[in-house]
Design a protein with these regions (language model features):
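A charged, amphipathic alpha-helical module
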Residues: 2-80, 213-349, 353-354
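Peripheral docking tails and interdomain loops at the edges
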Residues: 6, 12, 414-461
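An N-terminal, globular interaction/scaffold subdomain
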Residues: 61-150, 155-156, 163, 167-172
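Redox- and metal-dependent alpha/beta enzyme cores, enriched for Fe-S-associated oxidoreductases
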Residues: 76-78, 87-89, 96-126, 322-387, ...
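Gly/Ser/Thr-rich loops at beta-strand to alpha-helix junctions
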Residues: 83-92, 161-168, 321-329, 404-411, ...
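Short, surface-exposed basic-aromatic patches at helix termini and helix-loop junctions that form
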Residues: 96-100, 172-179, 333-338, 415-425, ...
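Internal, well-ordered alpha/beta segment that forms a basic, Gly-enriched binding/recognition surface
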Residues: 151-238, 242, 246-256
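C-terminal hydrophobic structural anchor segments
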Residues: 377-424
């Protein structure tokens, strides 16, 4: 059997798995063949995807797709379950600083219609509950709470408000109206310090007035008190500092993985696995220690491939910077099929990739990190970081994937594209990708193919 790095469909992974087993594959308790997720969980979309062929990628996918089992097992063992919504990376750091607490994002249900190819009927159920297709696919979260089939009911539900997208805010309020108690905390819209106003440096080369940092710190103090009451332990500075250091361990690994993959002469790991790996930073897929182990495996695989000049995408592939997560994972495969490769990304949570400052009081450090969220500040700030990372990654083109119905996507894509074109002059497009994009594959393919060809033609000028 060919063991060089490559992409495999699900049928090919069946054979690959049996070969790995014969060769002595050692797996964690959640391991097993990928196909079982189709049979048991009805994750039919896996049958349409291409996967990396490494045992490290197998571990990554099994880790992602067994989160509900992990949460159910944690509850059975007496752990407290915290549902955190919208902040994408801040509250989980606090939750995991306490013993016996697990955090997850109910927002993650937005990928369920994709994975189950809408057989779950979550989007239709959301529409029956008054949240129709004019809202972001995160509306799938609403019926998921009601059915209890996709994640356990949290012991504590925490949601950020203030500088959040309108459709998510409306969905969360509807959720509370249905009887799900929510602990709200507020984050203001980030702005630059005014003349003469004391400012604070934030991760990601950003800044905010000290008054905003103080405001968020006070809100996170309230969150910490609620988490402590749930756990029966005080979330003091010592615990919080240790939690920050542990979170930064995962973030450092991910940073090294991203730099190694995106700077390599060709792609040593496919775009789809990189997207999933980056998602782990948000809440550690409900297991912080295992997230570190999964990332260590991926990094070791990638470093080995780079040393041996083994890649899954050829050196001629056009270097693409991708903005926003895709509602349909199939789109990441499609880009590579058409001659592109990812050389950089902004999947809406860059603040969850940046290191949390360890030289500040813990709550202040987390407040600064929360305010660095690209979605709570001006789009121009986000675009400036995209431009810097495009230049660092030698991007030849930019794709902004618009999320259907998402209120934050109404104008931000246009603004980002305008700034990218003005500052670095590379081709850039905006695409809307629905949860299942099969009906649009031809159109999406044509637009991506044109972008790749234009970028490739630009090499000869």
């Amino acid at each position: 059997m060919n063991t060089s790095p490559r992409k495999l469909n699900l049928d090919e992974w069946d054979g690959r798995y049996e070969q790995l087993r014969r060769d002595g594959l050692r797996e964690p308790g959640y391991g097993g063949p990928l196909r079982r997720h189709v049979v048991r969980e009805k994750d039919f979309r896996l049958q349409q995807l291409q996967f990396d062929s490494s045992p490290a990628a197998l571990r990554l996918w099994n880790f992602l797709l067994t989160e509900n089992e992990r949460l159910q097992r944690a509850r059975a063992n007496g752990d407290k379950i915290v549902g955190t919504m919208k902040d994408l990376g801040t509250v989980p750091v606090m939750a995991y600083a306490l013993p016996g607490v697990r955090a997850f994002y109910p927002d993650g249900a937005w990928w369920t219609p994709c994975l189950m190819e809408c057989s779950d009927k979550l989007l239709q159920q959301a529409e029956a509950m008054g949240i129709d297709a004019s809202f972001c696919p995160v509306r799938a979260m609403l019926p998921a709470f009601e059915t209890g089939e996709h994640f356990p009911k949290p012991d504590l539900l925490v949601c950020s408000t203030g500088a959040v997208c309108d459709d998510f805010s409306a969905i969360a309020q509807r959720l509370e109206h249905l009887g799900h108690s929510i602990f709200w905390w507020e984050i203001p819209r980030r702005r630059q310090p005014a003349a003469g106003e004391t400012g604070c440096a934030l991760p990601g080369d950003l800044a905010a007035p000290k008054i905003q940092v103080d405001c968020v710190r006070a809100e996170l103090l309230r969150v910490g008190q609620a988490l402590g009451e749930l756990a029966g332990k005080t979330l003091d500075d010592g615990r919080l500092a240790a939690g920050i250091r542990a979170a930064n361990q995962a973030r450092r690994l991910l940073d090294t993985l991203r730099r190694t993959v995106y700077s390599a002469p060709a792609a040593p790991l496919p775009a789809l696995e990189m997207l999933v790996a980056e998602m782990l930073a948000i809440h550690f897929c409900s297991d912080r220690e295992e997230t570190v182990a999964v990332l260590e495996d991926l990094l070791a695989e990638v470093q080995s491939r780079v040393r041996q000049n083994q890649f899954v995408i050829g050196t001629d592939a056009v270097r693409i910077f991708w903005v926003n997560p895709v509602a349909d994972l199939r789109a990441m495969n499609l880009l590579e099929e058409l001659g592109g490769r990812i050389c950089g990304s902004d999947y809406m949570f860059t603040h969850a990739l940046d290191l949390i400052p360890e030289n500040l009081p813990p709550l202040e450090a987390l407040a600064c990190t929360a305010l660095a969220d690209p979605m709570v500040g001006p789009t121009a700030d986000r675009a400036a970081r995209i431009v810097r990372e495009c230049q660092a990654g030698r991007a030849e083109a930019v794709v902004v994937s618009r999320i259907p119905g998402a209120s934050h996507c109404a104008r931000e894509g246009e603004i980002i594209l305008e700034i990218v074109r003005r500052e670095i002059g590379i081709p850039a497009i905006e695409l809307e990708i629905p949860p299942v994009c099969d009906a649009m594959l031809a159109t999406l393919g044509s637009r991506l193919q044109a972008l790749v060809e234009i970028a490739r033609a630009g090499r000869t000028k």
